[in-house]
Design a protein with these regions (language model features):
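Extracellular loop-to-transmembrane helix junctions
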Residues: 48-79, 88, 131-143, 147, ...
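Selective recognition of specific alpha-helical transmembrane segments in multi-pass small-molecule
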Residues: 107, 112-114, 167, 171-172, ...
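Membrane-interface "cap" regions at the ends of multi-pass membrane proteins
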Residues: 1-42, 224
Length: 663
């Protein structure tokens, strides 16, 4: 990468106090980690646990080393060398306007789907929970206090700011429990899903529009304090018979490789980085920590009872289909779930048939009683069909922590702590995703001659307009999703994983183009190897979801059409069938759209590489890389500064303070 700390970064070159503003490397590490590490490394591995923990662990470890962390670091590198330009801007500069039109449209749509999906997971966890609403709401003023404290009161005192934020965060969590137990205050903080959508949209607009240092950076750093340090243990897990390739790699997603990370690493984090040598620590290091989080999530899934796991992760329709003749409309959800599990042909590692069981207060409960006991222990009415992975992670984490901290009585506390833990990180990703979408919309509009000013990230009116458009896109899908179980974002959840991984292919292609054009072709294999693997996985998965007679969206639509035409459905069943039919066609069309768009982008990239090689025109001067500019700043390169770096840092700060006093 040939990083050089003597070269001024985008934060130093522009320094507009809003988008281009340097951040302490430790804070930026936390902010970047929180931005990329939303629900993905938690939910994906939990769902992939059904396919077996060994292949999941192998892909998380190998995938992050050779693909995920490589992508994040190299995208951060090429953007930092280009004044913090976004994915779309770099595609324009290196591959032409065709490239930017393709990737900007692709990225805006995928980001909107991702933000709506992640927000839906958070809202499901927060709805009707005054504890979660109060605690999460308090992170906003806490972040504002941290931002102002570090910028105005005690500049550069990161440890002091960290302690302040951590203490206030713990008080917010404890206060949330007190609020939930108060009969007067609890109703005030008890919000339904629609109310939470409105609150979340308003917050995200403000977070994306305000200066980065004021709210997003300290809040993301605050989120990191909650995520790092989770304990781990060993256990046996559930098994699942099915095709690991390609869907295991799609399901785990962010735990090993994610295209969304490339968007955050380009145009967002590079605008705040102090020195080029911090790129490896922030880009590669943050992704390594995220993969560790994915391992913890996988452990959380496999430490709970298999029967409880499947009862939580089967939808009502799946329970009915699996239970067969044992299903009863008059029975409780717990009874039907237990009946469905008893009919599943799944065995544990000892070869025993799976059953629903739960241990509480020294008693081992089985069947429906086990599900009732588990729900009672965490303070929920039911745990059946709590799909999405969030509840599974919270149960697993609480079940583990109660063994070491607090015993049986602490189960509910740790469960709600885990729910807030997840929701806080999800909302952090939504904050940054909105900002990423804003940049991409600006890039897209900037290609129109009369709207070129929108491509300037320092233009305030353009920032507000593009932020509104970005928020409206995912906010509308989210509101429709909470209003209709079959509409809005619910209809597009199935395509999220594949589209996100397709975006990774675009990231690797752009990096390859930049590497070749810079005359570093001998190192092109570094992005090319994961590019080839990612294309093989995602294109195979997309083809199967489009054309497979059993898994394909259009095959599902044909089956639903046949059921509707048979005349045997009526009432709610008929309405559900029509909604599912529309969703199947929508997912099929979008899958084709994403596949064609990414294939076209890869073709444009390949054409650019071939043209460069044939012309034998190489060098940084032929790329959009910024020319060298002597830096007047100093900052340590690693997370922990050396003794010499601390000495130079003190001298630099003293000199800077004297200059400020002299005006």
């Amino acid at each position: 990468m040939r990083t050089d700390d003597a070269n001024a970064t985008a934060a130093e070159r522009v320094q507009d106090g809003a988008n281009f503003e340097s951040a302490d490397r430790r804070v930026l590490f936390g902010q970047h980690f929180a931005a990329i590490s939303g629900a993905g490394p938690l939910v994906g591995p939990i769902l992939a646990a059904q396919m077996g923990y060994l292949p999941s662990v192998l892909w998380i470890i190998l995938g992050v080393i050779f693909a995920g962390a490589v992508q994040d670091m190299l995208m951060l590198w090429i953007s930092a060398k280009r004044r913090g330009r976004s994915f779309g801007q770099m595609a324009t500069d290196e591959m032409g306007k065709v490239g930017v039109l393709i990737i900007s449209v692709f990225l805006v749509v995928v980001t909107a789907i991702a933000m709506a999906f992640l927000a839906l997971v958070a809202i499901k966890a927060m709805a009707s929970s005054p504890w979660a609403v109060f605690s999460l709401g308090m992170t906003i003023p806490i972040a504002l206090i941290m931002g102002c404290y570090e910028r105005f009161l005690r500049p550069g005192r990161v440890i002091e700011t960290t302690i302040l934020g951590f203490v206030l965060l713990v008080l917010a969590i404890v206060g949330g429990g007190m609020i939930a137990a108060n009969p007067v205050l609890a109703p005030i903080f008890t919000l339904n899903a629609k109310q939470l959508v409105v609150a979340l949209v308003l917050y995200s607009f403000a977070a994306a529009a305000l200066p980065h240092w004021l709210l997003v950076t300290p809040r993301d750093y605050l989120s990191t304090l909650m995520k790092i340090g989770t304990l781990a243990s060993r256990s046996n897990g559930p098994t699942f018979s099915g095709n690991l390739f390609p869907f295991l790699f799609i399901t785990i997603a962010c735990g090993a490789l994610s295209g969304f990370h490339g968007a955050v690493s380009s145009g967002l984090t590079p605008k705040a980085i102090e020195k080029e040598n911090q790129i490896r620590m922030i880009g590669y290091g943050s992704m390594l920590v995220e993969s560790f989080t994915a391992i913890i999530a996988l452990i959380a899934a496999v430490t709970i009872s298999q029967g409880v796991y499947f009862s939580m992760n089967m939808s009502p329709s799946q329970i009915e289909a699996t239970a067969g003749s044992a299903y009863s409309a008059s029975a409780s959800p717990e009874q039907n779930a237990a009946a469905a599990v008893s009919r599943m042909d799944v065995q544990n590692i000892e070869g025993q048939r799976m059953r629903v069981e739960w241990q509480s207060d020294g008693t081992v409960y089985t069947g429906a009683e086990a599900l009732d006991a588990a729900a009672h222990d965490v303070g929920e009415e039911t745990l059946v069909s709590r799909t999405g992975g969030a509840t599974t992670f919270a149960i697993g984490m609480a079940n583990f922590l109660r063994s070491y901290l607090g015993g049986e009585e602490s189960m509910a506390f740790w469960y709600h702590f885990a729910i807030m833990f997840e929701a806080l990180f999800i909302l952090t990703t939504v904050d940054n995703g909105t900002r990423v979408a804003r940049y991409q919309i600006g890039d897209l509009l900037g290609n129109v001659r009369r709207l070129r000013k929108f491509a300037d990230p320092t233009w305030r009116p353009g920032n507000l307009i593009t932020t509104f458009v970005a928020t409206a896109l995912w906010g509308t899908m989210l509101y429709m999703g909470v209003s209709d179980a079959n509409g809005g974002i619910n209809a597009m959840v199935p395509i999220f994983g594949i589209s996100n991984q397709l975006l990774s292919a675009g990231c690797f292609m752009l990096v390859t183009v930049c590497v070749v054009k810079a005359g570093l072709g001998q190192y092109a294999w570094i992005p090319v190897v994961p590019l080839v693997w990612d294309v093989a996985v995602t294109f195979t998965a997309d083809f199967e979801k489009i054309f497979d007679p059993q898994l394909g969206y259009f095959a599902t639509a044909s089956s639903l059409r046949a059921s509707i035409d048979s005349g045997q459905l009526e009432g709610e069943a008929l309405a559900t069938a029509y909604a599912s039919l529309s969703n199947a066609y929508l997912d099929g069309v979008l899958s084709v759209f994403f596949l064609v768009m990414m294939a076209a982008f890869l073709a444009v990239g390949l054409k650019t590489i071939v043209a460069t090689v044939r012309a034998r025109a190489y060098g940084d001067h032929l790329t959009s890389q910024e020319p060298f500019l002597e830096s007047n700043w100093f900052a340590p390169s690693g997370l922990i500064a050396t003794r010499l770096e601390r000495k130079v840092q003190r001298e630099f700060e003293q000199r800077h303070a004297r200059r400020a006093e002299l005006g």
